[in-house]
Amino acid sequence: MDLARKAGDRCYDPSTNRCLISRDTFWYAISLLFAGTEEQRRRGRELFATVTVDDCTHTPATLLAVLLRIPDALDDSLRTHLEGAVSQALGDAALVEFHDGNVNHPLAAYATLVLGGERSGQEWAVRLGTRRLRAFRERIGDHRSRYRRQAEMSEYNSLTYTALDLWFLALVAEHARTEEARRLALFLEQRLWVDVAMHFHAPSQQFAGPHSRSYHEDSLGGYSGLHCTMLAAFDDPLFLDPGLCERFDHPSALLQNSLAAILAYHVPDEARDIAWRKPFPYAFRMTTYGESYHENSRRETSHGSPSENSPFAFDDEIYPGGWTDLTTYLTEEYALGSAALPYVNAGHSDCLMARIRRGQKIKKLSDFRSIYTRGVFNGAEIGEKNISHVAHTPVDRSYLYEEGRSAVYQHGGTAIVCYTPKRAGHAGVTGFRLDLIFGFHGPFDDLVVNEQPVGALPLSLGSDTLICFRDYQTFGMIRPLPPSPAAGQHPVRLRHSGEFLLLSMVNYDGPPRDFSRHEINSWRTGFVLELATAQESSWEEFQTRARETHVTEVVEHGIVRTVRYTSGGTTMEFSYDPFKEVILSRRWNGVEESPNHFEVEAAGNRKGPFCPQMLYGEELMS
């Protein structure tokens, strides 16, 4: 509550009577109801009485949480006022449906319909919310094609938005009077806790990837809405650094704690055991299904005066949806996760995420490291305010907009990562690069480039660069794929940027140029990342093996990319069409790998208490 209240004190604007937006203002108001002085509590009640509801999802669900969880903090007139605001939101909430994309807003709408309908006697809303909860469960758990069955929801493993999913499901599970709605919400909440627990890497106290949507604190690690929700629900100690939200100008991530703190959660014992006691190595693959994407926003972004306002949009492009799969591999020392193909437009997705523990206990940011990627146009810089080139929209410091399209083949601790620029950025290009981003609150124990220890930075390197690092008990090797086109003879660059270390693979860096969408879609870049532990070999042996690795890339008909990587007697081969965004083949030692539903392996076992057989399927409902 203190985190939320202090953030609200900083953000509150007396001229608008708001903290950012109405939802966040109500989160601030909740925190004031628990403050130490009557003046603060009175101010909280005033905010509830005077701020209007601007949406039909998060905000009315928040008001319902207040009415259901802390009714004694309100007087009769204020409770009646909030009941009326929720009732007025029901009509618009009825228009919100799940379409294989965003999950948190539909779940908030369904909570509003069920609970708001029950409280106001509007049975149509209860029936509709229950029916949509049922359809949501059926879609994410039972959706099938000829070769695949869906295992994971579309907006998966987001350290911000998965937390919201848990809140709204927990609220319905605890308070719905309608038996089917309560049963569905409880099932979904508890299975989502199992999902969260599978991704939790207890040695680093971070969540393994991939992540459908991430803000900087989510990607960097050390604080997130999901960390805070897990802390509230599990009551096990976790390292948190809320200062990251101030560094990256993301106060909502602090304000929301007031809502997370007042809810009742229903964590199954299975999830607690998997989270904290899973054996290593722990590996899982799961299918998911996402909507196709087309830019359709008509909202405007304010720049100070109406004449300077600009449309708020995302990518002016169409991206195919459909099936893809997610791979996660955890050892005692590190966790590596990847998405074979992006989540929708991948505005701020982590298609690849590595978490490395750097100490026996996690007490500060330098005790772990995160590694992830972004493709960026025109000099966009991590941790700073930018103009997204593909969206033509200002982006604040809370996230770095993803301006590339990715495809990843991961097997165990090794990943082949292919990137191409987003077609929407084809005009007015002054630069495009792929950044492999390292959190850098502490140096590597060893960092070696082309067999030489790294001294002063920055470095400009050739495409055939070999990079090895030692981080506590984890060893890593990176081989860039030669960028095509390449920005000069030394298109690989290593440099510091604030609290980050960036390994950049640069396709273009020069005067403004316009390209056709087809031409820029043919640009290519990427890298191979291989991780290992000190339990597998010595640092010297790892470097020797890294020098003997080999990577090649062949492009057929100017379209299909095939990357072949050999290491220590094993071979990975990855074929991908970046124009259609279709993976054609993934072979490990010549054997095709194509996940069709859900598979878990815990220390070599595929059955047992740490190996759920599915997440949301109908078979588990009984």
Predicted regions and their residues:
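Extracellular polysaccharide-recognition and catalytic grooves
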Residues: 60, 65-66, 80-299
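Ser/Thr/Asn(+Pro)-rich, low-complexity disordered segments
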Residues: 1-73, 77-96, 108, 132, ...
